[in-house]
Amino acid sequence: MLDLSELKKKTIEDLLKIAEDLGVVSNGRMLKQEIIFHLMKKVVSDGGAAIGGGVVEILSDGFGFLRSPEANYAASGDDVYISAGQIKKFNLRTGDIVSGEIRAPSEKERYFTLVKAHSINFTDMAKLQRYVHFDDLIPLYPEERILLECNDPISVSKKDISMRVIDIVAPLGKGQRALIVAPPRAGKTIILQQIAHSISVNHPDIELIVLLIGERPEEVTDMCRSVKGEVVSSTFDEPGYRHVQLAEIVIEKAKRMVEHKKNVVILLDSITRLARAYNSVIPSSGKVLTGGVDSNALQRPKRFFGAARNIENGGSLTIIATALIETGSKMDEVIFEEFKGTGNCEIILDRKISDKRVYPAIDISKSGTRKEDMLIDSVCLKKVWLLRRLLSSMGSVEAMEFLRDKLLITKDNNEFFDMMNS
């Protein structure tokens, strides 16, 4: 039995070896999807069973496909077709995670077809239960802390105190809607990688998705190799509709998981480029704001960001997104102004701090979390307020240097707070 999802995770060299063992003829110029297609077709044609899975994307015609995270949810030749009848029978929606038995395409068909579904959203068909739709769930303030301070000695340097600073200045909770406001070369990508690592180490129960929109290909590779979680991307050389399609599938998948009481974190880099993509694909309304932004363009990216919430009786969706400023583009400034105030946590990076090579380049006085008293115990909260009063009289660079020096001589934040007593 061959599993389509497992084949997609293999390298081309491994696939060619499997093809050789099964007697599948392949030349050296075939794409990875073509090799997988011929492998699956060979197994099914010989009477073997094949299993396929992926995330449902329903098209406007009523039928749909199972898209693969390995292909960044883009349309490819090894996608699995789902008929409109099956979609109605199982009440499938875009974002559902489906696995089941598939058959090879006939002469007039182009895709594998789902024959029998085995599980939907990791639940066996026999155990499927009713669930409340995402829009009907009750949102609450974040109550459970996402601790970022990581004591993993293998991968975290003692001199790296970025996560400890965020835990003090702008603590995160499950269901947070956080915005990292960053000028160019201020270290936002490194901070995102460290947040992803801390979540995977400290909170293995959280489903982590890193969504990269409009990034450079080498940064995507670096993120894939440094993050233990799902990393999907649409690079800067891809058209705007691809950015939009990827973002829509990711947010719908996250919603389906939250409906099943899972805790999901999406790290989005960046919401500015996502808003630019929406601006390029939506039909023109005739009303254009400053910088060339259509008045209706920001509604859908706002809906994406606004989906982050803590859910009553279990489940949460946390979105930590970066917003670009000081890029020289008027459009980026307008987009940032529209998103400013929509989150309940802001981490502001300062170019003046990064220019002096002081990291993390966080502006302590401007960064913070709403309702932080629900995440931090009262004793630590009083010390955080005392620290803020002390740092408020300093400039942004001096405040960060002062806090950095104090954190470097302590092992963790608890020791730092104990030191404040003395």
From Swiss-Prot:
Keyword Transcription regulation attributed: yes
EC number: 3.6.4.-
Alphabetical keyword list: ATP-binding, Helicase, Hydrolase, Nucleotide-binding, RNA-binding, Transcription, Transcription regulation, Transcription termination
Physiological role: Facilitates transcription termination by a mechanism that involves Rho binding to the nascent RNA, activation of Rho's RNA-dependent ATPase activity, and release of the mRNA from the DNA template.
HAMAP family for the chain: Rho (MF_01884)
Family membership: Belongs to the Rho family.
Protein name, UniProt field: Transcription termination factor Rho 1
Organism: Ehrlichia chaffeensis (strain ATCC CRL-10679 / Arkansas)
